[in-house]
Amino acid sequence: MTGRAGMLPGVVVAVLAASAAPDLGRAQAPLARDQVLAALARATPQHPADFTGMDLSGLDLAGIDFKRANLTKCRLVRTNLAKAQLSSVTLTDAVATEADFTSANLDVAVAYRVDLRRAVLRDASVFAVILYDADLSDADLSGARLIGPMNNAKAQRAKFIRANLGVDPGNQGMGIMRVDAISVDFSGADLTGANLRKVLLVRADLTGADLTDADLTGADLLGAILRNIRGRDSIRGLDRAVHADQAVFND
């Protein structure tokens, strides 16, 4: 039989084949370590590896060079990325909860809305990283070097112990390189001994944060909320902070 009726079997087969085709943009089986390494081995500067939407959770990828890979919407839950080279990677909308980035290099990464809750970034280099709307709640960035915009990020209860968020005097030819923490939620965060020199803390919420021995010299505190902070008497440079008179303290 010819005509539309004769075409039906072929149409059905085509529809079934299309429905069975894997959608790489959706959740799929986790990748194995050797699959990740093979993809990175094939990568070139012109064609970085593309792991968009893929699941790399739980893998041991410590020390691996990701060669500017695209990790958009990638799952990296509890992945070991200690000392990994993640410079210039894309982590936008990635989920990296409880991942280990200890001493990793994340310089110049693009990480809009990245989920880093409970992640470990101790001593990591996070220079010129875009962290708009990122979630760093309960993350550990102790000793990390952090420079770049993180407007509207969440960092409740995060650890920034002795972290360096201050202005970078060596790169001022590129414009002022510092942390832009406008409207960031630092409530309950531990900023003990942190370098916050010239950090933009405009409208940031530091309620209950520990600022013992933190350096706020030149930081912009316009509209910042500093209620119930700990260690106020030991804060360095508070008298030289910008707009400190317009910050909200208990008194």
What are these regions (language model features)?
Residues 1-11:
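Bacterial N-terminal signal peptides that target proteins for export
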Residues 9-19:
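Bacterial N-terminal signal peptides
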Residues 24-251:
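Tandem repeat scaffolds
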